[in-house]
Amino acid sequence: MICAVYKSSRKQETYLFVPKRDDFSQVPEPLLQMFGTPLLVMLLPLDRKEKLGIADIDKVRSELAQKGYYLQLPPPKDNLLTQHRRDLGIED
């Protein structure tokens, strides 16, 4: 299975995987509006991959088959001040 991976023109580190290049027919319109203009990053052969960067490859395959797309959001940002306070033993 080969899928197309697009990055968002509006949201940093946000990617949309679709089964066919330039086929967004299964992606809900509100999601496409939030996503902005999809910018093609790569065509990705999922059947030859065992691991992806931060996405669970089994979940990507499953959602592509069931929903027709997979949306990868950026990981949550660490709050450095909270982490520093925790390291110092200071509770909020």
UniProtKB/Swiss-Prot annotation:
Where does this protein come from, organism-wise? Shewanella amazonensis (strain ATCC BAA-1098 / SB2B)
Q: Which Gene3D superfamilies match?
A: YcgL domain
| Protein name according to UniProt | YcgL domain-containing protein Sama_1929
Q: What PROSITE patterns does the annotation carry?
A: YCGL
Q: At the top level of its lineage, which domain of life is listed?
A: Bacteria
Q: Which Pfam families match?
A: YcgL
Q: Taking every annotated instance into account, which residue ranges of this chain make up the domain YcgL?
A: 1-85
PANTHER family xrefs: PROTEIN YCGL (PTHR38109:SF1)
* Residues spanning the membrane: none
